[in-house]
Amino acid sequence: MATISINLKEGDIERPGEVIAGIDLGTTNSLVAYMKDGAPVCVKDEAGKSALLPSVLHFASGDTIIVGEHAREQLIKSPADTIYSVKRLMGKSYQDVRGFEDFFGYKVIDDDTESLVKIRVKDRFYTPVELSAMILKEL
């Protein structure tokens, strides 16, 4: 991930020029890019490879959450613990997705307290926003 210096005392970003960044939280893949000399440059991962990250989460044993390609590899083996296309559920009520629950390998539930859907994984419940934040954190 790119490093940006921040002057905590002043609250300013220390940079030689303006930094323009874009984040694509995609239904299938996500990535971060920035502008350099008028052209977009995708942020690369630690290995220097493309940082195109599959928007997939896998909840492994314990508290381990795997994000990206390794999570996508678990879709067939463990569909109930592997979350994909969560962006499609953001801001949706259970009424909005009623009749489509079987299209997901994971459990989409009705949450009367907020009238928004939640996703059940093992013994925990997550909102689509919480799950999307986990994907963004990996970028």
Regions found by a protein language model. Give the residues of each.
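N-terminal phosphate-binding loop and flanking beta/alpha elements of the actin-like ATPase fold
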Residues: 1-54, 59-139
